C-alpha cells in the first residue's frame, strides 16, 4: 500500500478466500509467465480438470486458488490470438461456474479486458479514464456514469474508449446510466468507522423506509410480493 506505482492501467482486488487460505500467494492478482494478470470474483468449478491439463503443458502453480487457471489459460491462448480480447473470448468458453474478471497483458499494455458470467461487473465512464468494479459504489469517487455489463459480455477498456462484445461475439452498444447515489452515502463521512456510521444512521434509515408507507398516521405494508414468492417456491 505504501509503495507508489506509476502508470495509467492497473488492476487490484480484495475478496473472500473461496479456495485456499488467505495468504500472499493466494492474493489477487494472479499472474502467468509475467505476462498475464487476472483478478476474479466467482468460482471456477472445473478448475481441477483445467489445472491438470495446464500442468501437462508445463505451467507451474504458485497458489491454491481456482483463479490461477484463468491466467494460465489466457497466456496459452494469446499465442494463437491477434488481440487480448480474442484470447479471452476463446478461453471463457472452457470455464464452468461464475466469474467477473479483470485481465491485463504485458503484450497489450494499453487495455484491461472485463467479462462476466453469473457475477456482477460494472464499467465506470470517467472524464480522465475508465474503470472496472463489481459494484458502482466502489467507483462513485471517480464517476457517476456507469455501464452495466450483461451476462457473457466481454469489454475492452482503454483510457479513452470502451468496446463491448456480447456472448456471441457481436459488437454491442450498452447504455450509459447516470447514478443517483451520492458518494457520501458509501464513505465513513465524519464517523470513525462504518459500524459507528450504521448505528447513528439507523433513525434516518427507518424514516426513509417508512416514509412512503405511512397513510393517515398508520403504517401500510404490502405482503403481496412475499406471498407470490412463497407460492412460487
Where on the chain are the PLM-derived regions?
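Conserved short alpha-helical segments that host acidic/polar catalytic motifs at enzyme active sites
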Residues: 1-197, 201-227
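A short, hydrophobic C-terminal helix/tail in secreted or cell-surface proteins
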Residues: 228-232
Amino acid at each position: 500500500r505504501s509503495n507508489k506505482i506509476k502508470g495509467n492501467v492497473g488492476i487490484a482486488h480484495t475478496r473472500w478466500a473461496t479456495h485456499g487460505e488467505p495468504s500472499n500467494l493466494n492474493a489477487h492478482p494472479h499472474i502467468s509467465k509475467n505476462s498475464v494478470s487476472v483478478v476474479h470474483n466467482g468460482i471456477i468449478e472445473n478448475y481441477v480438470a483445467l489445472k491438470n491439463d495446464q500442468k501437462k503443458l508445463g505451467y507451474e502453480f504458485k497458489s491454491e486458488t481456482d483463479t490461477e487457471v484463468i491466467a494460465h489459460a489466457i497466456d496459452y491462448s494469446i499465442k494463437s490470438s491477434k488481440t487480448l480480447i480474442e484470447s479471452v473470448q476463446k478461453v471463457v468458453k472452457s470455464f464452468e461456474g461464475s466469474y467477473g474478471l479483470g485481465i491485463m497483458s504485458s503484450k497489450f499494455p494499453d487495455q484491461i479486458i472485463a467479462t462476466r458470467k453469473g457475477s456482477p461487473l460494472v464499467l465506470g465512464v470517467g472524464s480522465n479514464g475508465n474503470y472496472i468494479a463489481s459494484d458502482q459504489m466502489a467507483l462513485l469517487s471517480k464517476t457517476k456514469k456507469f455501464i452495466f455489463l450483461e451476462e457473457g459480455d466481454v469489454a475492452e477498456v482503454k483510457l479513452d474508449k470502451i468496446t463491448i462484445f456480447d456472448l456471441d461475439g457481436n459488437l454491442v452498444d450498452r447504455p450509459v446510466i447516470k447514478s443517483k447515489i451520492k458518494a457520501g452515502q458509501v464513505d465513513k463521512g465524519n464517523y470513525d468507522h462504518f459500524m459507528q456510521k450504521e448505528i447513528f444512521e439507523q433513525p434516518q434509515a427507518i424514516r426513509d423506509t417508512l416514509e412512503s408507507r405511512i397513510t393517515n398516521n398508520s403504517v401500510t405494508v404490502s405482503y403481496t410480493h412475499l406471498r407470490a414468492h412463497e407460492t412460487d417456491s
